[in-house]
Regions:
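Long amphipathic alpha-helical segments used for membrane anchoring, targeting, substrate engagement
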Residues: 1-30, 79-100
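Short acidic-hydrophobic sequence patches enriched in Asp/Glu that either
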Residues: 5, 62, 69
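Residue-level signature of catalytic and energy-coupling elements of molecular machines
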Residues: 13, 46, 70
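N-terminal intrinsically disordered, cationic/polar leader segments
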Residues: 28, 32-52
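Short beta-strands and strand-coil junctions in structured, solvent-facing domains, enriched
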Residues: 37-39, 58-60, 78
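A short interface-forming secondary-structure element
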Residues: 51-63
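Short, well-ordered alpha-helical segments
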Residues: 65-81
Length: 100
């Protein structure tokens, strides 16, 4: 009769965690705000890789609006990373559930 093997479960969990970490490091998302006025690229560790700002937004001199657009684009990118993480973790947990 098959039994519960805690050591095997822990080993599989560690392997799945390492795979998840690698996937997240390789994940890159892009988000924008203001109809593309500001765009941000972010990796799975939530490090900003690049940011593009339409020069017209700078010329307008509306610093407060530009700050809001940068904040919105960064928050949108962060949300996309969170969603990718949840999806990846969901797959990892379903793989472990077969062992319980």
């Amino acid at each position: 009769m098959g039994g519960f093997n805690l050591q095997e479960l822990m080993s599989q969990a560690k392997r799945q965690y390492e795979v998840m970490q690698k996937k997240m490091q390789e994940t890159i998302v892009e988000a924008s705000s203001g109809g593309g006025t500001v765009s941000v690229r972010m990796d799975g560790r939530k490090q900003v890789l690049s940011m593009k700002i339409d020069p017209e937004a700078v010329k307008s001199g509306d610093v407060e609006m530009l700050q809001d657009l940068v904040t919105a684009a960064m928050n949108a990118a962060s949300q996309k990373i969170d969603e990718a993480m949840q999806s990846t973790m969901g797959g990892m947990l379903s793989g472990l559930s077969g062992m319980l």
